[in-house]
Amino acid sequence: MTIIGQVEGHYILPAENKTTKYEHIIPALIAIEQDRSIEGLMILLNTVGGDVEAGLAIAEMIAGMQTPTVSLVLGGGHSIGVPLAVSAKRSFIVPSATMTIHPVRTNGLVVGVPQTFAYFNQIQNRIIEFITRCSHIQTERLLSFMHRTDALATDIGSILTGEEAVAEGLIDQLGSLQDAISCLYELIEAAPLRYTDASVPSSTLGKDGCSGTNGKIKTKEKSHPQE
């Protein structure tokens, strides 16, 4: 599955924009989760971000899947693409890719009252909670990247390279397509059969992730249902 361009929300973007539509992705994820012939899912990301509600909805869907999932950031996983990247059971990023972390913002006319900014802060807290729940980065560290003023010329935030994203615990592993595919096969082999009796034991490897992770193991027992 590919998540590319801009994540489209409740408004249709101009025809010249490459978009990922949540009304297409969400039903596809449900079908994948229910199809017993599908053993695993790889998510390829090259996105500039987009609508917060739509992106977070897709990320929560992926995080709540029992199907083994692996994400691979190619090119960029910016803005709301960060939660999408970390939502899989195992996340990879290629060395040349980058990830942009910045505060929540909006375009157009807004009401200049404290309640508006409190609402933006509430949305931002939801995103931060999801990222820290599904990765190893600490909340304080994530906020420090989000509020940097010396990294972007006309904006607030940070751009992390692939190596930096892994070093900070945002992404699990630096790797290529082959690395991501190999990891997905490992997760598939280690995973218990889906839709079976709950007494079937779960493999240790399936819980801990893939081998060759230099100690950066993410345990994700998913029970949870424009930046």
Descriptions of predicted regions:
Residues 1-82, 87-102, 106-227:
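N-terminal organellar transit peptides
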